[in-house]
């Protein structure tokens, strides 16, 4: 299973501005690129705060064939949103989540955040690539890309300036 962590971050490494969840602050160029990039994946994993930020949008896409799993300590709190095989909630480990996806014949997973999900998958050694859009903004505080101490080596795959913007997309391979 290919697992790609996809994220937009400020130049100083924050994925959410101050105490505001979500990436509404990201450039329109990144938002266009992100929507297109998601088409390369047949499944998505995110933490519950990320889910709550995009809940209404995701629930309207439940029939698009993408299997979405939301990591939460309390899956029962989301029972009303559960759609088996399309949108599921779990407190399982990252390895167990990937087994569920693999058993459902999924091959490419977009890891969408937030920092809790990033930490769990990186700590487990399950991330193959990281695609980060570096936005030309400095926040000074907010939600970091990761919260736990990490020492993960990466190798650059590519970098490109997103069209009509000052945003930089960098793709890395995780060295295992």
Which stretches of residues belong to each language-model region?
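Enzymes that bind and transform nitrogen-containing heteroaromatic metabolites
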Residues: 1-176
């Amino acid at each position: 299973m290919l697992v790609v962590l996809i994220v937009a971050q400020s130049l100083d490494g924050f994925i959410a501005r101050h105490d505001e969840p979500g990436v509404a602050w990201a450039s329109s160029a990144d938002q266009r690129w992100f929507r297109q990039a998601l088409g390369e994946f047949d499944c998505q994993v995110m933490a519950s705060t990320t889910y709550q930020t995009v809940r209404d949008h995701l629930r309207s896409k439940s029939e698009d064939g993408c299997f979405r799993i939301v990591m939460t300590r309390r899956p029962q709190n989301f029972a009303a949103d559960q759609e088996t095989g399309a949108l599921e909630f779990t407190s399982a480990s990252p390895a167990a989540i990937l087994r569920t996806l693999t058993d459902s014949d999924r091959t490419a997973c977009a890891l969408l955040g937030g920092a809790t999900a990033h930490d769990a998958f990186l700590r487990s050694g399950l991330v193959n690539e990281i695609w980060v859009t570096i936005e030309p903004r400095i926040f000074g505080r907010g939600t970091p890309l990761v919260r736990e101490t990490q020492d993960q080596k990466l190798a650059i795959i590519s970098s490109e300036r997103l069209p009509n913007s000052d945003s930089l997309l960098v793709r890395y391979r995780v060295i295992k």
